[in-house]
Amino acid sequence: MARSAGAGHEFALDVLDLVDSIPPGHVLSYGDVAAMLGSRASRAVGTVMRQSGAGHPWWRVLRSGGHPPTGHEARAHEHYVAESTPLVRTATGCGYRVDYAVARWIPTEPPT
């Protein structure tokens, strides 16, 4: 069943509200954000972040394995250091990833 434009807009607002609620030093994956909103649409979360995430803490939403958003690794690293987000050095890619097991945010209340 296709979503209406209004439903897509509501989903985008829900994504951004949830991302805004992630505390400094913590992260979620695209899949986590989708699941917390009752969806399996992790790619749709990525689309929302790409199109509308600039004014939101976009660096707190990661690819699987704790990898920062593609193309934004250096800018994300600055935020991670400023927020004391736990990082792990890697020999490949951008040279680091977020220690997802430690930094993953588990909200005490489900999103509304």
Predicted regions and their residues:
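Nucleic acid-binding interface residues in structured DNA/RNA-binding domains
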Residues: 1-112
